UniProtKB/Swiss-Prot annotation:
Role played: DNA-dependent ATPase and 3'-5' DNA helicase that may be involved in repair of stalled replication forks.
Secreted listed as a keyword: no
Gene expressing this chain: hel308
Span of the annotated motif DEAH box: 144-147
CDD domains referenced in this protein's UniProt entry, alphabetically: DEXHc_archSki2, SF2_C_Ski2
Gene3D superfamilies: 1.10.3380.30, 5' to 3' exonuclease, C-terminal subdomain, P-loop containing nucleotide triphosphate hydrolases
Positions of the Helicase ATP-binding domain: 33-199
Keywords: ATP-binding, DNA damage, DNA repair, DNA-binding, Helicase, Hydrolase, Isomerase, Nucleotide-binding
Sample GO molecular function, one term: DNA binding
E.C. numbers: 5.6.2.4
Protein family according to the UniProt entry: Belongs to the helicase family. Hel308 subfamily.
UniProt name for this protein: ATP-dependent DNA helicase Hel308
HAMAP family linked: Helicase_Hel308
Amino acid sequence: MKIESLDLPDEIKRFYENSGILELYPPQAEAVEKGLLEGKNLLAAIPTASGKTLLAELAMLKSVLNGGKALYIVPLRALASEKFRRFQEFSVLGMRVGISTGDYDRRDEGLGINDIIVATSEKTDSLLRNETAWMQEISVVVADEVHLIDSPDRGPTLEITLSKLRRMNPSCQVLALSATVGNADELAAWLDAELVLSEWRPTDLMEGVFYNGIFYCKDKEKPVGQPTKDEAVNLVLDTIKEGGQCLVFESSRKNCMGFAKKAVSAVKKTLSNEDRETLAGIADEIIENSETDVSSVLATCVRSGTAFHHAGLTTPLRELVENGFREGRIKIISSTPTLAAGLNLPARRVIIRSYRRYSSDSGMQPIPVLEYKQMAGRAGRPRLDPYGEAVLLAKSYEEFVFLFEKYIEAGAEDIWSKLGTENALRTHILSTISNGFARTREELMDFLEATFFAFQYSNFGLSAVVDECLDFLRREGMLEKDPDALVSTVFGKLVSRLYIDPLSAALIAKGLREAGTLTELTLLHLICSTPDMRLMYMRSQDYQEVNDYVMAHAGEFSKVPNPFNIAEYEWFLGEVKTSLLLMDWIHEKPENEICLKFGIGEGDIHATADIAEWIMHVTAQLAGLLDLKGAKEASELEKRIRYGAAPELMDLLDIRSVGRVRARKLYEAGFKSTAELAAASPEHIAVLVGPKITERIFKQIGRREAVSEFSDIEPLEKGSSDGQRTISDY
């Protein structure tokens, strides 16, 4: 099916033809035939790189040009940024594109001026909770990676959000994009959608197992040279020799880094002079953005053409790695499975070095087939690679047979709703009532019967869980006591708007009521004791140190569990460890020191602080509403967590481009406020932070003196990025 034959305005056809897209892939053509451009609901369950995003674009553009508004929902912030950059190309068609991924208690009415809005599932849910007016104007909703409805963490939010959007806008077109799953027909039936189910790919995918020096596919065998003792390194070299790149998936961050380092000496020999020059520039940027031990290792790897990628890296470092790979300079990325979750980063060959993952419940277990398929789907770059290869590694013949049967010859599992637990339902029941979607128990059950959970399980067990949630919400003062009506209290409405688990809100309110003196530690531990906080893992070497700290500061905790209750006490120690990380952060301990002390990555610091800033903001808001002590202290701590600094630096940190390191440098040099900066000479400031930053500072504080005449002045200390970031950038 040709682009020119589609029922689209000529300017859209020209846009794609000028981009080199003249003809639709078979699954795309099937989607058009099944009503994609006629406003029909559609589920596309097709492999990675088979053109799902183009389907979304065509549906959105058609709808917007007919006066509608499009919402594109993604599971990850990184994926939101990627799609936003892509959709901004539609500006030549007169389209306005917006993005929203954070600040969960804002309406973001300004986003409504856009024709296409990209948002995460959580942000979309919060926009609904805050009754954002333009949400009622949505004419087409795209749910990307909709198979993640199976995820215990993200699935319930996506499921409820889709249910609310469909009820709010019954005529709205829903386009769901999914990996190939076992029960795609069931998911399509729930969405009242036409199903496009296909295994077609634009590049052939050869899936197989590497054993004893040979890559075995279903219908062929391919010997691979063995220049080194590591089979995966040999597979990497074989790929580079044929002009390709590799993604290597590992089960842990440690293994990621280890393999990237292991491959350095071999990959370095394959680089051209141009590769080396470009990679040196990328490595320098990595060092400029971060001065931790991990970033130093990453820079060393990148200079040799290898890299690693995991959540312990900051967003800027991950983006540098991704861009270097897309440009073809970085030959191999060793990654945890997070890279398989939606980012557009294909490679000639995907190597899955470990197919087992650790579970606290059952130890090392084989990954699901669906997860394998997501990783394997990254093999083969459309229009660039003649084929793609997905390789599992076997150490024995028995393992070889197992891998073929488990992954190569098997289909993906069915996906199942994870909505039917009290933990999942508690927050969504409150928001459903607060938004007016349900005013009685009968209306609430009617709404929940439209969810995927009810579609799969009917009402089995749902009624009892709903009653438990309603009892909890009434008991904690978030719902009125009226047994015949469901009405949120002012407290309940605020909890819903703040996008916090009602249990977290109840724990915060109880903690503030019962606390004696509120210290930094008291408030930090209070937010770390909520289910919304992501806790640090307790290593064996942590127990004694954290326990000693608890004994020395017992009076600052609202309650210390009995150490003989082992499970409860260990959980408590994890809360304390996380509190201590935040304590070090707000007292300006260097990031590398924090990383080494807690056994984490720089990205973990920022992710933890990001969540903590949000929960501390919630704490300040709840304390203010309920007239509890701690509102002022929590508000001050919220800002300190945002910047990772002591109170005296807050005035300086209100200036963009001044982060915790530069603020401390300016403060120690005698410039303790924006007023003192305004009275200073540009030359003096430039010696401290450099001319570029000085120019930015002076523009913001109302002095636009040119600093170009002293552009040769270097700052006293080099190494910090020109664009220091706050937590919200991560």
